A protein has these predicted regions:
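Histidine-centered divalent metal-coordination motifs
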Residues: 8-12, 161, 222
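Short acidic/histidine-rich active-site segments
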Residues: 212-228
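Low-complexity, acidic/Ser/Thr- and charged residue-rich accessory regions of DNA metabolism proteins
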Residues: 333, 338-411
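Cys/His-rich short segments
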Residues: 254-324
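Extended substrate/RNA-proximal surfaces in nucleic-acid metabolism proteins
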Residues: 2, 50-191
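An N-terminally biased module of ancient metal coordination in phosphate/nucleic-acid-related enzymes
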Residues: 1-93, 98-101, 391-393, 402-410
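Divalent metal-coordination and catalytic microenvironments
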Residues: 8, 42, 85, 108, ...
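Histidine/acidic-residue-rich catalytic or RNA/ligand-binding cores of hydrolases
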Residues: 15-18, 49-53, 167-174, 205, ...
Length: 411
């Protein structure tokens, strides 16, 4: 079964998230976008877990769906069987290892809410899991993996957004130089890595040590409307077992939907306070120091990949999965109309397109240009074609500042 899956998301119980992060709204936005399978997010949070138990029903195969009584009326107009949920959560581990402070985020997928109960009980002995849906714990990533395997051998641990400077397994600030250094003798139990918004598969192909891992992509959405910024293209039996096989072996993982990596917040080196954005070559020439204030630059993902790469830029992995780089539809409409994504004009056009043409992913990936033109006009049709063909100008993000993707030549 062809499925689009977004496995790393957050509920309203994580810090800096939208209050809209409820099971009903997640189901609604997933349907609207054309996503068949999403993570629950935040399984460690006790209140959220109880809400999931109340509002979701097990399908008996390791996946859940929203109980019919909770499905929003406006969700029912979208075709298909509705959204499937898989139990998921993210843990922020901050700890000392090999003489350095490490800050690593890991995503865990589990086949049941019962397994989540046991995992949460174990984690609660280590630290506070009540105040943040993504708990911050003084727990070595190796020990987290060991705990998960003990509690639930069928669990899946995926290092999250692996290149982010501050909170990832390979990050420049507080990560490691290899997955093996982080997870030691348990590294063979890691089968997939999340590339994050600021990198794409091609960047990861440059590091031969990563060849054995499946590369997955997820939105890390902090509000339901951000679901699917990145996602996985699957052709699987729609069950936890099918998902497990895809992530652990690649069977049924057909590819990913990506941000243009330059749009991510940490693609280039830079210093946001001074408005300084630099390529790896420029940053090296300056010794990693901000030319305005003299402070240390935040090293971006592009530079960090360059540090660890043993293959030239442009290398194509023979068995690498396909990937598509897209721009969210509201951003396309915004660029074409000249209004902000939150404006009534842009939101009105977005709703009209969804109502007439289908889901957001269908519009961005499949709907013929002529149909888009008939519904939304020539400029929006052209903008979507430019995205599909990669004919865009990329202004890289840096030091927490999102990059910009220009769909039209502004000259």
């Amino acid at each position: 079964m062809k499925t689009i899956a977004d496995l790393h998301i957050h509920s309203r119980f994580s810090m800096a998230t939208s209050k809209e992060g409820t099971p009903e709204n997640l189901d609604f936005w997933a349907r609207k976008k054309g996503i068949s399978l999403i993570g629950t997010g935040d399984f460690t949070h006790p209140v959220w877990r109880e809400e999931l138990k109340e509002r979701l029903v097990s399908e008996g195969n390791g996946l859940y769906r929203l109980r019919d009584a909770y499905v929003k009326e406006e969700s029912r107009k979208f075709p298909g069987e509705g959204t499937r949920f898989v139990v998921s959560g993210e843990i922020s581990s901050i700890y000392k290892k090999n003489g350095k402070t490490r800050k690593v985020h890991n995503v865990i997928l589990l086949p049941s809410l019962e397994a989540a109960d046991v995992m949460a009980q174990r984690l609660e002995k280590i630290g506070n899991i009540h105040s943040d849906g993504r708990p911050i714990l003084g727990l070595d990533s190796h020990d987290l993996l060991e705990m998960m395997l003990d509690v639930c051998p069928e669990g899946i641990l995926i290092p999250a957004h692996i290149w982010t400077p501050h909170f990832s397994v390979l990050g420049a600030k507080s990560g490691f130089d290899s997955v093996e250094e982080c997870f030691e003798e348990l590294a063979p139990y890691i089968h997939a890595l999340e590339t994050g918004l600021s990198s794409d598969p091609a960047m990861n192909w440059r590091i031969s040590k990563l060849d054995r891992y499946q590369l997955v992509s997820n939105s890390d959405a902090h509000s339901p409307s951000k679901l699917g910024r990145e996602a996985n293209l699957l052709d699987i039996d729609c069950s936890y077992e099918g998902l497990y096989r895809a992530i652990q072996t690649g069977e049924g993982l057909e590819g990913t939907v990506e941000f243009f990596p330059e749009e991510g917040k940490y693609h280039f080196d830079g210093h946001r306070k001074c408005g300084v954005s630099l390529s790896p070559v420029e940053a090296e020439r300056l010794g990693g120091i901000c030319p305005v204030c003299g402070k240390k630059l935040t090293m971006g993902v592009d530079h960090r990949v360059e540090q660890l790469a043993d293959r030239a830029e442009g290398f194509v992995k023979k068995d690498g999965k396909k990937y598509e780089s897209l721009v969210p539809l509201p951003e396309v409409i915004s660029a074409c109309m000249g209004y902000s994504t939150a404006s009534k004009k842009v939101q009105g056009c977005f709703e009209q397109m969804i109502q007439t043409l289908g889901t957001e992913f269908d519009i961005l990936r499949n709907v013929p240009s002529e149909d888009i033109k008939s519904c939304a006009g020539e400029r929006i049709a052209e903008g979507i074609e430019n995205v599909r063909n990669g004919k865009v100008k990329r202004i890289p993000g840096y030091d927490g500042e999102y990059g910009k993707i220009q769909l039209f030549d502004e000259n």
